[in-house]
């Protein structure tokens, strides 16, 4: 994987396992212990900003670490990125539920299956694009397996490892700012839906 390629350029194969551990543990901790307080204190929209901002910082530090071959800095960036996963991913994952609620509010029809299908499609599409992007960038930079890599290939790997995620996260923040307005209407929507349910009883 990309972490492995960076790690092998910095030290050895053992560092790959270390980095994976430093990524996994903070990610779990971020989801379990930081997501809830972040949602409660900031709300869904601002929690996304907090998580995305933390991940941008983490990826930027990892990018600088990869360029300077600084292992402690690489670990710090990995930990920051992992801890930021919870505040970012949890509110994003409830967007489908918000869409279902808002759809019911507008149409008086609750179509949960469509929301699930859209999320599933988006996940598969993003996975495919991510895999394709790795192949495209490695191909364009002249990557050759099991051989010493050129400076262009190394720069391409660092770009995928750090700077491309930063760009995508900035786009997420921009898109979320202009598209997601549900937070302003959520209380009204939920109150109306509850009112309709009570009227049926």
Name these PLM-found stretches.
Residues 1-201:
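Membrane-embedded alpha-helical bundles of multi-pass transporters/translocases
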């Amino acid at each position: 994987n990309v972490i492995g390629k960076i790690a092998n350029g910095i030290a050895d194969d053992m560092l790959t396992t270390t980095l994976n551990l430093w990524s996994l543990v903070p990610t779990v901790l971020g989801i379990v212990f930081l997501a809830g307080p972040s949602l409660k204190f900031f709300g869904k929209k601002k929690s996304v900003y907090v998580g995305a901002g933390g991940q941008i910082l983490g990826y930027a530090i990892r990018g600088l670490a990869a360029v300077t071959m600084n292992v402690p800095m690489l670990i710090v960036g990995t930990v920051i990125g992992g801890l930021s996963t919870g505040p970012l991913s949890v509110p994003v994952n409830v967007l489908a539920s918000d869409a279902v609620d808002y759809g019911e509010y507008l149409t008086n029809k609750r179509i949960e299956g469509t929301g699930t299908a859209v999320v599933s499609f988006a996940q598969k599409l993003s996975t495919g694009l991510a895999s394709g992007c790795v192949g495209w960038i490695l191909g364009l930079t002249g990557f050759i397996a099991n051989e010493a890599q050129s400076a262009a290939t190394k720069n391409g790997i660092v770009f995928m490892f750090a700077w491309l995620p930063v760009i995508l996260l900035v786009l997420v923040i921009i898109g979320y700012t202009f598209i997601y307005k549900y937070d302003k209407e959520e209380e009204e929507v939920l109150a109306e839906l509850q009112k309709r349910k009570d009227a049926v009883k």
